[in-house]
Swiss-Prot record:
Residues 386-436 are annotated as: Disordered. The gene is pelF-2. Keywords: Carbohydrate metabolism, Cell wall biogenesis/degradation, Disulfide bond, Glycoprotein, Lyase, Polysaccharide degradation, Secreted, Signal. Glycans are attached at residue 111. This is Probable pectin lyase F-2. It comes from Aspergillus terreus (strain NIH 2624 / FGSC A1156).
Length: 480
């Protein structure tokens, strides 16, 4: 009896310690200095209503996600509502149909009706000075994403799994969306089974952001590319935003991993891309990205061929060039069973807009094993972010020196998704028969195309915009 009582007491103390822990580690990269809820006493909300209230209020908080918060059905369903079959869906129920929007996204695509969960189409508003931290492996937010807008700043999102947001439907909802923010650290997060973007920034600058040690799991039964891979992965559109993207695991995707537009600047290092049946990087003319020390395994197209002036993807031949620009040697990328990754656009160096701080990079040969062991939920104790946690690392000097020289429940299988293997890429399908159709422009309607009338459905999402077609950033849907 005494032994049982001792074990129970130890378990209770362990639970209390976990609950009181809050944020683990410190942010690095562009989000260095982010404190979130700071010294606020960690507390766990009792239900989804209290969670939404705490996230959106003006009080600094450390919010513990100590269980699954399931928003499915909490705002009702839209039954028999207006949807369509886009030209990308050539595989029926294994593909993604699209929810019609009030700005007429479906256009002339064949109309169908569908039923979807309303909660997923708009994320929960998150205010400034918040730390949102999962406890152990228990922290799950199901059926609804997080939405940071309107000046929200100083936010930490750590060790949570966001999943099951209308994955059957394009425009079903986003997992994490930023627009007009600053100092955001996203760490040890897992995202899976979403209808639209796993992570997205809007047209207003998202400021200084670090995304680290996170898993973007694209395995799905509703694939826009009709091959079991998720297409809508990472989209950066904010003007002059600066994003450190480090030590993340991006797998089973087919595009937008990431897609960068406007003058979004990404420093992507020590990430592991695996089993991408389409493209990883797609950078628009104003976007900039320094890509170094990453591993691409079974990635069909690591980098699209257009607009390469602002992209520097480091190869073994580029180390001296990088040294002359940054004052250090860059780390070459490694590709296995993948397409080409070749771009030495020096325009990226003039786009380094503020101090990214001192960084620690590891050789690409160590990336795959490190990232698989550390990225995602339930792994906060697997290592910190200091140089001692990463073997054979190479410190990178702060970018201030550069600036001086040069003047960014299982409804769908959670819990029984098979373990990721190292098998080859999924079968490649050319999405859609129309020759003018392009995956890279889906969701971006040319001004030359006719603008259809807004849907009359009471469940249509989004808000119409004035002037030339420009997709809403954060209406009742998220972002394209």
């Amino acid at each position: 009896m005494t032994l049982i009582r001792t074990v129970l007491m130890a378990a209770a103390l362990l639970g209390a310690s976990a609950h009181a822990q809050g944020v683990v580690g410190k942010p690095f990269g562009f989000a260095a200095g982010t404190t979130g809820g700071g010294n606020a006493a960690p507390a766990a909300p009792s239900d989804i209503k209290e969670l939404a209230q705490w996230l959106s209020d003006d009080t600094p908080r450390v919010i513990l996600i100590d269980k699954e918060f399931d928003f499915t059905g909490s705002e009702g369903t839209c039954a028999d509502c207006a949807c369509c079959v886009p030209s990308s869906n050539t595989c029926g129920s294994s593909g993604q149909n699209a929810i019609e929007t009030s700005f007429g996204w479906c256009g002339s695509s064949p109309n169908v009706t569908c039923t979807y969960d309303k909660a997923g189409t708009k994320g929960m508003d998150v205010g400034s000075d918040k730390s949102i931290v999962g406890v152990g492996s228990a922290g799950v937010i199901r059926g609804k994403g997080l939405r940071l807008t309107g000046g929200a700043s100083n936010v930490i999102i750590q060790n949570i799994h966001i999943t099951d947001i209308n994955p059957e439907y394009i425009w079903g909802g986003d997992a994490i969306s930023l627009d007009g923010t600053d100092k955001i650290w996203i760490d040890h997060v897992k995202i899976s089974l979403v209808g639209r973007q796993m992570f997205v920034t809007g047209y207003e600058s998202s400021g200084s952001v670090t995304i680290s040690n996170s898993e973007f799991d694209g395995r799905t039964s509703w694939s826009a590319s009709c091959d079991g891979h998720h297409y809508w992965t990472l989209l950066g559109l904010g003007k002059n935003e600066q994003i450190t993207f480090a030590r993340n695991y991006i797998h089973h995707t087919s595009g937008r991993s990431p897609k960068l537009g406007e003058s979004s600047y990404w420093h992507s290092y020590n990430n592991y891309w695996s089993d991408n049946s389409g493209h990883a990087f797609d950078v628009e003319s104003a976007g900039k990205s320094l890509i170094e020390g990453n591993v691409f395994s079974n990635v069909k197209t690591p980098l699209t061929k257009e607009n390469l002036d602002g992209v520097f993807a480091v190869s073994a031949d580029d180390e001296s060039t990088c040294s002359g620009s940054l004052g250090r040697s860059c780390i070459p990328n490694v590709l296995t069973s993948s397409g080409e990754l070749s771009s030495a656009g020096d325009g990226v160096f003039s786009g380094w807009l503020s101090d990214e701080g001192d960084l620690t990079l590891m050789p690409a040969s160590q990336v795959a094993s490190y990232v698989k062991a550390h990225a995602g939920v339930g792994k906060l104790g697997a290592g910190d972010y200091s140089s001692s946690a990463i073997p054979s690392s190479t410190p990178a000097p702060s970018s201030s020196a550069l600036a001086k020289r040069h003047g960014g429940h299982d409804r769908h299988g959670l819990g029984h998704i098979p373990h990721l293997t190292e098998g080859g890429p999924g079968a490649w399908h050319t999405p859609g028969p129309a020759p003018s159709w392009s995956w890279r422009t889906i969701g971006v309607r040319s001004t030359a195309l006719p603008t259809p009338s807004p849907s009359s459905s009471s469940c249509a999402i989004g808000k119409p915009t004035a002037g030339p077609p420009r997709f809403p950033i954060f209406g009742d849907l998220g972002i394209f």
